[in-house]
Amino acid sequence: MMQKSPNYVKKRSYWIITHTLVAILAVLVGIRIGSNVTFRQLIGLTSSAFDNNQLARVVNRESPITQENVDFTLFWETWNRLEKDYYDTSKLDAQKMVYGAISGMTQAIGDPYTMFLPPETKERLDEDLSGEFGGVGIQLGYRDSQLAVIAPLKDHAAAKAGVTAGEYILHIKDDLQKVDVDTIGMSAEEAVNLIRGKQGTLVTLTLAQKGQDPHDVKLTREIIEVPSLELEFIDAPQGKTAHLILSRFGDKTVQEWDQAVTQINADKSVKGIVLDMRNNPGGYLEAGIDLASDFVDGGVIVSQKGRTSTQNYPASRVGRLQKYPVVVLVNKGSASASEIVAGALRDRRNAKLVGEQTFGKGSVQDAQKIGKGAGLNITIARWLLPSGDSIQDTGLPVSVEAIDN
């Protein structure tokens, strides 16, 4: 499953594991190109042409972009030749061609977290963070530039079938939709669109852990409604332990968290806290800062290193839980915002991290809303722990190794 207050200041910014943490559960006309020219201005596409599913007439062949080193001649020549020579005109869908061109532009950068999101994909990602969506219960991302399972969602189809974090997704098959494709070169949003579908229908995934043989898993799609936080109390002779199980940093996480904190502080027998962020792919950075702030007495929670400067993000609230000792549970499915919280508690509270080394997503995406309901996720920075360390691609090491049951 991070958006400028979008993930670090605005609420609608999030770190994409796309992890989703693209976390991403199977993810223009109006987009800015250059400094002051929109794609609509560049190609003169009309909404009526799209509505009629016809190839739009390009009226502005010469790019009005002011940069002298940008030449769109090859682009227009390709468009013209397809329009003129391609034998099956029914496949010349102007809208898809525009989306494909924009996707190619972002993919050319070579950063899997910088991506164009067509309206349907953008809508689905928003659903993911809201906690209600249809699918098989998998957060998608990348490992070694290959599509992979970041985290299976508890009590849903993938987890029940034994799917585990870190498995590569090699192939997707859906007989009903006539889908039978390898995932090499596939974007996270493409995989999301293929894996999601109508409730009760089947999709088969070919999965493999690194160095192991692939295996097929047949999953039945379902409607998924998942709270982001669960609280349970564990009794012990010396007092209760509050076990906070945090599955993502979504739209309702801070609200759910505040309710849990109230419960914990109301129970005078609570002596400690276990913050469980195993298989948490991330989400809104703002939520992560709020939660981490409850454990500390002010100070920096995370820093963001951009092109030209570094910005510090301090604690956003009074530390209501700072009197309790805390242990943090993580694993290889813990990514992005969950790594920020774990790292902040390690550096600021000397909290012990228990479990497995984390995923290692240390980049910041600005999740921008653009025309026609589409989205554009742009990597704008790396985030740094209070210690100044980056965990990009390396993850957080743990103090005590433990294997998930």
Describe the function of each predicted region.
Residues L170-H171, N377, Q392:
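Hydrophobic beta-strand signal
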Residues S336, P386-I391:
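Metal-dependent DNA phosphodiester-chemistry modules and their immediately adjacent helices/loops
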Residues G131-V181, A381-R382:
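PDZ/PDZ-like domain segments forming the peptide/carboxylate-binding groove
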